[in-house]
Design a protein with these regions (language model features):
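The cytosolic transmitter module of two-component sensor histidine kinases
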Residues: 1-4, 56, 125-126
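Regulatory sensory and allosteric helical modules in signal-transduction proteins
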Residues: 42-88, 94
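A short, aliphatic-rich beta-strand micro-motif
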Residues: 94-102
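Short regulatory alpha-helical segment in sensory/regulatory domains of signaling proteins that mediates
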Residues: 7-26, 36, 87-88
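Sensory-domain boundary capping and coupling elements
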Residues: 101-115
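Short coil/loop residues immediately preceding or within conserved phosphate-binding loops
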Residues: 17, 58, 96, 108
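GAF sensory/regulatory domain recognition
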Residues: 21-56
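Regulatory loop-to-helix N-cap segments in sensory/regulatory domains
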Residues: 115-133, 140-141
Length: 141
């Protein structure tokens, strides 16, 4: 267990999510692989998933602009075919909060909170909890 893992586990527990992932900008052919995750019971891991090219995802374009993405209904969020394929690949991703983790001027990591199975209304408090967790994670990167 690293210093990162308790932050993800707490976010999973406090917000009662299905999955929390941290994707880091690491050298290599795959952009932003999942390096850490916390999972609810019965939820599949994304640690070895390498079929979704994040460079083509509309959410990442928002993150690069420094914006957090809050989606209560992912299916309705973007018509983009690559985005829709990602939802299925990620186990029926239905709602998410995706928060950039910047170190200096660069996007160093992506913190994602996932809800599987059904849309979910997120609160400002939920989004703020993700922003606070991202700030804590930035200290370890």
């Amino acid at each position: 267990m690293t210093d990162i893992d308790p932050i993800l586990a707490r976010l999973l527990r406090d917000l009662r999510a299905s999955r929390v992932t941290l994707r880091q900008d690491l050298p290599g052919d795959y952009a932003f692989p999942v390096t850490h995750e916390a999972l609810a019971d019965g939820v599949s891991s994304l640690l070895r998933e390498r079929t979704v090219d994040l460079r083509n995802q509309p959410v990442v374009r928002e993150l690069l602009q420094g914006r957090q993405v809050v989606q209560p209904d992912c299916v309705a969020a973007f018509d983009d075919p690559a985005f829709q394929r990602m939802l299925e690949t990620y186990g029926g991703l239905s709602a998410q909060i995706v928060t950039p983790v910047f170190v200096g001027e660069g996007l160093a990591a992506i913190l994602s909170l996932h809800e599987l199975g059904a849309p979910r209304g997120w609160t400002e408090r939920d989004a703020a909890a993700c922003t606070q967790a991202a700030a804590r994670l930035g200290a370890f990167l």
